[in-house]
Amino acid sequence: MRVATWNVNSVKKRLPRLLVWLDERRPDVVCLQETKLADAAFEQLLGAELAARGYACALHGDGQWNGVAILSRVGLDDVVVGLPGAPGFPEPEARAVSASCDGVRVHSVYVPNGREPGSEHYRYKLAWLAALRENLRADTREALVCGDMNIAPTDDDVFDPAAYVGQTHVTPAERAALAELQDQGLHDVVREHWPAQRVFTYWDYRAGMFHRDLGMRIDLVLASGSLAERVRAAWVDRQARKGQGPSDHAPVICDLDEAPDGDIGPVVPPPSAPLLKRGVATTPQGAPRS
């Protein structure tokens, strides 16, 4: 089973790229974030195209902001929209949806950005992560937690740690919250598969960050123990970040039981630009802002 997660940064803006990508990569399950469409609008825009490709959809959107979805062609059962017990800002936001796909509990999550350390948004982010952790703790089913975590797990997951000092996505409290989430028996499949390689999933649109490979790894697939053992390939589809009108995130792909493209990765295709030496080019254009 091929599972992918992708922050598309607006489904409407990503058409027809999304459909072309589905046809090329043929994932069985897709977790989308930042769909930025109400459910009815999503169905009107994509329902027929997805049905023709064999996908059923679990949607949780609220229009202009946020929005998550699960697309599955291997079953879509026991759908839960939202995150029980999660705080709102001030109302609950469309940041989580889960479903069972071919016997696997799949969660598509879009963790709040946090904006500025110590701010109200930052406290909301930490509280939301705590609610996610408690939901996973209470559910003993084997699970894949997929999505935009808006946290780089370690300094190895940013192009230059010194450039992000004082910003969100890298603070000790955020990383501790992510570690506590993983303490529920979840494995970061890309990092476990590629422990020493330079791997990013997000590059700011500005200042040629993508072409210079100045990014962050904030989009993760976290797998519970027995599922992690089934992983045959785990990689970032950098090709989807190229060309005209891309999302600022690349999809992350995880193959269970068999790998149709072989054990490729960690980034496909690899960056062509020379690697940046840490501490040389600082002043990033910043972590994601929404």
Explain the meaning of each model-derived region.
Residues K36-A38, F42-E116:
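Structured beta-strand-rich core segments of catalytic domains in phosphoester-bond hydrolases
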